[in-house]
């Protein structure tokens, strides 16, 4: 019945989404007075120093859905060089390690406190300090950039740098919150599904890009492949 209702609304050009809880409903969510400061180096270190806030933020089920999204689009993980840009405390890489046999797993993160936590929780994975605006010459077959771009003043530059780390025929899986229902004051960018597609077409004009909403409607996604000169939206 839910699927039928969603299809009927979609035919009318409308979407049905579950609205996420306000940040104020979670006692462990940090109070944000300035999104710029919240996303600064100082703000990130403060966040990752708050154990309760970090534990409240983590969602292992979400990591599994991200991994499954890649599988849906034919992305393989076994014997692949995999990177997670903005890896936080390493939860996504830990999930990949438990399910697959990648050639290598590398986490890139701007917060040194987050890296310390990640190294303690997933000791056999490589974690590196990383400034997304500087990029890297290292190459990977699969790159995740999950819930990162909404925190950045220059997401276009950041995404181009991430794509620049792809090996030939490599794939980037990106997610950002659905800006129509995102209520977190710590975010700088808010993309509706439509504006998300416009943003991607401007940044990825020469790449294959498949976009959509994740099943619960909470997040926009993009599966970007370094191969065809094609941009399609699902």
Residue ranges and their predicted role:
Residues 157-168:
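A short glycine-rich, Lys/Arg-flanked "PGG" loop and its adjoining helix->strand segment in the class I
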Residues 180-186:
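A short acidic, helix-capping loop that chelates divalent metal ions and anchors anionic groups
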Residues 146-149, 175:
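Residues lining the SAM
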Residues 170-177:
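Conserved beta-strand signature within the Rossmann-like core of class I S-adenosyl-L-methionine
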Residues 1-138, 142, 146, 157-159, ...:
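Conserved N-terminal segment of class I S-adenosyl-L-methionine
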Residues 168-169, 203:
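Structured helix-beta-strand junction loops
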